Amino acid sequence: MIHFIIALVLFGHGVAHVSGFIASVSKKDIGFHIEKPWIFSNNITLQSPLGKFFGILWLAATAGYVLAAIVLIASNDWWTTLLIPAATVSLLVIIPFWNTVPPGAKFGAFFDLFVIIVFTTSLKEYLSELV
């Protein structure tokens, strides 16, 4: 039962990344401050060419989290192999656009950090016993 709950959380977190892609390619208001620059330069926004590249990376994080959830439900042990890169990419796309992303994405960054810490330390074995 616990693996279904974890898979649902991972799936939901993954799907939430679609908003980063949408914000990079459309003017639709979905909570992002698309006019604000990223933290390194005032010339780069989420809708600049580099910002659009980051939007594609948001989709990669979506794919990683969603696939990890599916593999977990299928009871395969290698779901964490997908999860760690997905969390890393997610964190790497949120941090540069910290001024741009909505509060939910900032919370998601802390979730990504939690995932990276748990699944790259001995805590991984403890969680593996639960699922």
PLM regions with names:
Residues 1-131:
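Membrane-interface extramembranous regions
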